[in-house]
Every structure is written in structure tokens, then in C-alpha cells.
């Protein structure tokens, strides 16, 4: 195995359980604004809609504002909400709940603690800055992360190669063999690594083009230590 120096870790569904975070925040939002208790099926419907919009954003087919408006408009339609839908208010309340909801995987703290003894850890994430910073403040593994790179602040989303420019500006190390991208998304994280000629570790199951693969984040020290 190469002598990596920098681990570029995805945030959501890699270190943090975003599926559960999303479920809680969405439920609180629709209960507050519409007095509605969402079913698991309805939450799954939103998950699919939201994921679709994020994939379109990665492909530069929509803007961030179109994503925010479209996902809530489409979801409200699926729920049969027929009155005028104020997507701006729904998104604002939803993201406020997201920023306060911290659900990390049980192994994340110990994984980051152990790996930080050998590697420099960075987080690379597509997301809204105040939401990601808010959740990071409550993360137990925060002391072991050197810096968080957020698409909102950089101005581009993974898998765009330009995202890596921000990382290089921070490290000053142009040797791409020193980096490893770790994440759960084939279209965002793994493709990003391929786009910038950096090795990748896919967190998940199934066939994939990554350099390495682990079932979940708890297995990362076994691979790298």
C-alpha cells in the first residue's frame, strides 16, 4: 500500500449518519409547519427526490437554489399538499433542524482518533455551509479533523476537479500519491478521486471502480494501520 499522508473523508453517510439526520429533521419540519407526522415511506420518498437533485447538482444540471426549491416542491406534491407551498420557508426550517441534528456512526470517534496518529484528516463535503459547520460543532471526532472543505465555501461540488485545488492550497503538497479519498458515493467521492488522479476507498458494498473498499467506516483502521 502507498504511504498516504492525507485522508480526505466524506462527511455524510461516511462519518455521519445522514439518513437518520435527514429523517429527524424532515419529520420535525413538517410537524412544525403542517402538523403532519411523516411515515417512513414518505421519508423514503423525500430521500429519493433529494438524492436525485444532488446528483443533478453534481452534474451541473441545476443550481443550489434550484435544488432547494425543487426538492421541497416535488415532495409537497407527493404528499398531496395543494395549498401554495412556500419552499423558501420549508427549506429554512428544515436546514435549521439539520444544523442542530448530530447523528454520527458509533465507530467514527475511535476511527478518527486512531487514524489521526498517522495521517492528517480532512473532511470534503458537498453541502450547505452553516448546516455542515453546525453539525461538525457537535461531532465527537471534531478534534481530530484538521479542516472541513465545503462545496458552498469553495464554489464547486465534488466530483469537479476544482474542488481539489482548495485542498492543495491548504496542504501545499502536489504529490497526489499522498492522498486518499474515502466516501460512500460513487458519483461524488469515487468519481472525484478518479477525476483528480487520487486513490479512493469506497465505503459500501457492490461492484465499484475504487482502489479499495470497506463495508463501513469502522473497517478503515484495519486497511490503513
Spans of features found by a protein language model:
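Asp-based, Mg2+/Mn2+-dependent phosphohydrolase catalytic module
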Residues: 1-7, 113, 127-225
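Solvent-exposed, flexible loop/coil residues
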Residues: 20, 71, 106-109, 140, ...
